Design a protein with these regions (language model features):
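Surface-exposed acidic/polar loop and edge beta-strand patches at domain peripheries
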Residues: 1-159
Length: 159
């Protein structure tokens, strides 16, 4: 089993996008720090040839410029919030619309548009935690939201 992190490319704002690779005898998983994207999952087909089973793009800029969120973490929320508003306790929270007056997948600054911090974690599994924060007020959302996505690969498969 192995795990590594290397540079993948640059975002349109000039930030370095990292590529984390987790690998065992059966599977290779590649993850990007931009939007915690699952970039590739490579497994062997029935003839033993490696094949990538994930749809994706070749460059960091391609992921950033395409709005389909392919392979990306989605949040604070997923799906559509009608009218870009919702009740919270005794108030109506107004968030930024991004699709015909609605808010889809957390709007323009959701986790699918966020640079995550990626780190290596030693241990029995190949593991790469990715962390990001959505500060209070992001697209109108209340409160800070801290997210950690733990991507792990054991000796025989994904965890």
């Amino acid at each position: 089993m192995s795990v590594s992190i290397q540079d993948f490319g640059k975002s349109t704002s000039g930030q370095t996008v990292k590529l984390a690779t987790l690998k065992n005898d059966f599977i290779e998983v590649q993850l990007l720090s931009y939007a915690a994207i699952i970039h590739r999952i490579i497994v062997k087909d029935r003839k033993g040839n490696p094949v990538d089973v994930v749809l994706g793009y070749d460059t960091a800029a391609d992921y950033e410029l395409n709005t389909d969120s392919m392979g990306a973490a989605v949040g604070r929320f997923a799906n559509r919030i009608a009218g870009a508003q919702f009740p919270l306790y005794e108030e109506i929270v107004h968030i930024t619309p991004n699709q015909n007056g609605n808010c889809l997948h957390s709007g323009l600054h959701g986790f699918n548009h966020t640079m995550f911090d990626a780190a290596l974690t030693p241990g029995e599994t190949a593991s790469v935690p990715m962390t990001a924060t959505s500060p209070a007020g992001t697209d109108g959302s209340p409160g800070n939201f801290d997210l950690t996505i733990q991507n792990s690969l054991a000796k025989r498969g994904l965890v």
